Amino acid sequence: MAGEQKPSSNLLEQFILLAKGTSGSALTTLISQVLEAPGVYVFGELLELANVQELAEGANAAYLQLLNLFAYGTYPDYIANKESLPELSVAQQNKLKHLTIVSLASRMKCIPYSVLLKDLEMRNLRELEDLIIEAVYTDIIQGKLDQRNQLLEVDFCIGRDIRKKDINNIVKTLHEWCDGCEAVLLGIEQQVLRANQYKENHHRTQQQVEAEVSNIKKTLKATASSSAQEMEQQLAERECPPHTEQRQPTKKMSKVKGLVSSRH
């Protein structure tokens, strides 16, 4: 659910430019201002500055630790190390709680109010919902409150800073994701191949059936034509019986008749 970082880059760039020429207490003051600044929720570039890293070896090391905590940590991390860290202003406290919500949202699509109340050390539901609404308006998360089931349903959240030591894990996760995609693609290709084979076999069978039907039609047509011719011939024979020749009187009969007449 983690998404691209929302606009805070211009303001952060201004702080980075100021920090490059700053040291000592002036730098710690600048860090405090960055941690309070509205819209600034990523701190990796500031942490990479050499003079900021130099704070680790001086009296102001706690401010470097605090900056690291805002970059990678959560509100429970601050509470666990509160004694060794500078005290937070109200604005810084709310921002760290917002970042804690982002961290939870990157792992869970539906965050129970009970989890939020525990991690943010809040007891009042109304205050919790107001804090969530603030986070939504700052565009670091998108979602809705399910008051009936007491859930925060997350649709989107920004991405937080990434430690260098975590990059290998991210690369490993991406490789696993790519392997999974390749396996899915291979499965789809096999299904397409089977579908094409089925289609080809079906088409071949259909052609065979059509050829057989055509042959049967031709046979039936030829048989019907032959039967019709035979029937016509039989009808013709019935309507026209064979002609019998009449006997012609012979000359002997005529002679006999002449003899009879002469005797009279």
UniProtKB/Swiss-Prot annotation:
Protein name (Swiss-Prot/TrEMBL): COP9 signalosome complex subunit 7b
Presence of the UniProt keyword Coiled coil in the record: yes
Stretches assigned to coiled coil: 194-237
Self-association state and partner proteins as the record states: Component of the CSN complex, composed of COPS1/GPS1, COPS2, COPS3, COPS4, COPS5, COPS6, COPS7 (COPS7A or COPS7B) and COPS8 and COPS9. In the complex, it probably interacts directly with COPS1, COPS2, COPS4, COPS5, COPS6 and COPS8. Interacts with EIF3S6.
Q: Please give the biological process terms from Gene Ontology that the record holds.
A: COP9 signalosome assembly; protein deneddylation
Species of provenance: Mus musculus
Q: Mind listing the UniProt keywords for this protein, alphabetically?
A: Acetylation, Coiled coil, Cytoplasm, Nucleus, Signalosome
Start-end of Basic and acidic residues biased regions: 235-248
User: What InterPro entries has UniProt attached to this entry?
Assistant: COPS7/eIF3m (IPR045237), CSN7_helixI (IPR041481), PCI_dom (IPR000717)
